[in-house]
Amino acid sequence: MESKIAVITGASSGIGKAILEKLSKNNFRIVACGRTGNVVLGENSENIEIVTGDLLLETTSDELLNKAINVFGDCDYLFVNAGTIESGSIETIDIDKMCKMVRLKVESSYRIIYTFLKYFKKTGKGYIIITSSVLGTKTRENSGAYAGCNYALEALAESLRMELSDTDIQITCIEPGLVQTNLHRDWPVHPKELLNITNTLVPDDIAEVVMEIISKPSHIRIPKYMILPKGHKI
């Protein structure tokens, strides 16, 4: 694959970090955004630019796009990956943390896609890959808020798919089941225990799927890609 240019949000850990590492090994030039700035550089670090940015700020989307253009001359891919998980019943969930999750998962995703889409329309090509969830297609007890955020991303992606169907701009929603990341580190009981899943997915599984998707010929469209671990019933 020829050298391409990508912007990745949520690149400091989990799925975003795995995608960063996989793209770097495949000769991508990358602008990596992590809120903490703790983006670990591996292979081909000279082709990675780090932006420590808060995606809740209106200026961050423009900053990321401008960084890609000014440093690498273009942008081919946008990976929308930043997010967090807040769970609990509608009655008992921490409402402030829930609202922050909604802003990060929904508002910031819409905002950055809005910004990059205008550039992709101008250049006539581009690919947007959104990390959603299996809980963007269904819900379960104590997951209404998180599922609702992912439903919003799925709706955005489906509308974009139709609006862009006759263009060379593509969009894919990745819908993972349970992935072993730090997002569950503060949970009193890990979801793999609650769901009785022995072998969860790992971030590298998602990165492998991403490479498979973006390696397809451009006339092949993959709007959704659900990936689940064995034993994931919901």
PLM region descriptions:
Residues 133:
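Residue(s) in the substrate-gating loop at a strand-loop-helix junction
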Residues 12-13:
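Conserved glycine-rich cofactor-binding loop
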Residues 113, 149-152:
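Active-site helix of classical SDR
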Residues 173-174, 194-231:
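C-terminal helical subdomain
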Residues 26-41:
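Conserved glycine-rich Rossmann-like NAD(P)H-binding loop of the short-chain dehydrogenase/reductase
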Residues 89-90, 97-102:
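Substrate-binding pocket helix/loop in short-chain dehydrogenase/reductase
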